Amino acid sequence: MMIMVKKGSDPEVVEIDEIEGLGLELEEESTTSKKKKKEKEIKSIEDLPGVGPATAEKLREAGFDTLEAIAVASPIELKEVAGISEGAALKIIQAARKAANLGTFMRADEYLKKRESIGRISTGSKSLDKLLGGGIETQAITEVFGEFGSGKCFARDTEVYYENDTVPHMESIEEMYSKYASMNGELPFDNGYAVPLDNVFVYTLDIASGEIKKTRASYIYREKVEKLIEIKLSSGYSLKVTPSHPVLLFRDGLQWVPAAEVKPGDVVVGVREEVLRRRIISKGELEFHEVSSVRIIDYNNWVYDLVIPETHNFIAPNGLVLHNTQLAHTLAVMVQLPPEEGGLNGSVIWIDTENTFRPERIREIAKNRGLDPDEVLKHIYVARAFNSNHQMLLVQQAEDKIKELLNTDKPVKLLIVDSLTSHFRSEYIGRGALAERQQKLAKHLADLHRLANLYEIAVFVTNQVQARPDAFFGDPTRPIGGHILAHSATLRVYLRKGKGGKRVARLIDAPHLPEGEAVFRITEKGIED
């Protein structure tokens, strides 16, 4: 170091000045090295720049209790929960990303190696697993839509009881279809047609609680079949349904059994006829009918089905409980299996928006797969979402449960949202509300992606379909959610009914897989080839 001094200056002063200057330089170097050292030693939230004890406490209370959680947050989120400026929030996030090694570039071969650690949950069907690249992926959102018109239908003369604004109607399901088709029009769907319903309510039995209540019917569906199963009861009633249609029996408790498997001597469960006719609906008013005969009959005509989103059944005027469509419990059982059997040794979180979760179905699948039904049920955590805000809140609360089970022998490995869009669709009606709905849905999907990536879990969502009025060719339906959901879901699978009671899954979008189809069946074991 060189210091310029005046002539005649004391050399000792120069020396001292040089030493002081040198000390200043050493101090600067020491400060720089300390800064670097400090940056390298970020191991907790308090180590982040600008985060003191008070801010750290606010972040933890809001669920941002790890560097990874902060790294994937948005500046606006941190600004709101911590009461800091957006600029300060951005600096905190950037430091967290650097400390957690997120947001940096990685060579493709290294990324490929990282993807080898991704877990997959078997669906129970080898053909469907192959279509999905090995099963339902962790760190991804898999969307399934189009499960509608499942082939579980009734003969055209089946009587139905329904209400419009408390005005009762009792007529055949064929007459009901014709009436609403003339008002609302019918849409081609799968092997038949569907008519949207508005302000139509039926009485339904909640199997889980045993309660009878009034609920909304969303669609009425029809298709043609050649043969039906006729089930005659000792009370004089009879059912004419397709072979795969579930019938509510009393076999070691209440359970749904496909019509083709019903035998003489079985007991069909219904609701007391006089209770329904007086419209005095109360809990526990059940009656039982013994099956006297079961036979296959030639039919070659239209069969019909009502779509009941909430409980998937409705009560006919004769008191019999009639089932409609229901699926998606298999994964909740399969994920609990060890990896060598297609699972991930994991627990399940199920966010239920339409009251579609059925523990009875879980028990049936688990029992037929040789598992302890009670143990399987213990590792499924269910919450009912009553509106879109509640649904989004439950995703945030799900993170608490994920953290709670993180270091146990059954960490959460599957998050199910059934259905993803039903509340958004019913609450935000019309073009004027579309922008707000899509923004809210985008935030919801971002939260799901964050959980999937941060905790290495699989997110499985079901979706509804709607008609495309401008579609003159091809499939006239499309999934709800628009471009927001189309671009956010990692894999999109379209389900439709095939011939002979089989189902067809079509992979329509995936970043690493070709489009294709797989055929599978729904049995007492869930999904099978």
From Swiss-Prot:
GO terms for molecular function: ATP binding; ATP-dependent DNA damage sensor activity; damaged DNA binding. InterPro entries: DNA_recomb/repair_Rad51_C, DNA_recomb/repair_RadA, DNA_repair_Rad51/TF_NusA_a-hlx, Hint_dom_C, Hint_dom_N, Hint_dom_sf, Hlx-hairpin-Hlx_DNA-bd_motif, Intein_C. SMART domains: HhH1, HintC, HintN. Keywords: ATP-binding, Autocatalytic cleavage, DNA damage, DNA recombination, DNA-binding, Nucleotide-binding, Protein splicing. This protein undergoes a protein self splicing that involves a post-translational excision of the intervening region (intein) followed by peptide ligation. The keyword Hydrolase does not apply. One of its GO terms (biological process) is DNA recombination. NCBIfam families: intein_Cterm, intein_Nterm, PRK04301.1, recomb_radA. PANTHER family: MEIOTIC RECOMBINATION PROTEIN DMC1_LIM15 HOMOLOG, RECA/RAD51/RADA DNA STRAND-PAIRING FAMILY MEMBER. Involved in DNA repair and in homologous recombination. Binds and assemble on single-stranded DNA to form a nucleoprotein filament. Hydrolyzes ATP in a ssDNA-dependent manner and promotes DNA strand exchange between homologous DNA molecules. Belongs to the eukaryotic RecA-like protein family. The intein interrupts the ATP-binding site. This is DNA repair and recombination protein RadA. It comes from Pyrococcus horikoshii (strain ATCC 700860 / DSM 12428 / JCM 9974 / NBRC 100139 / OT-3).
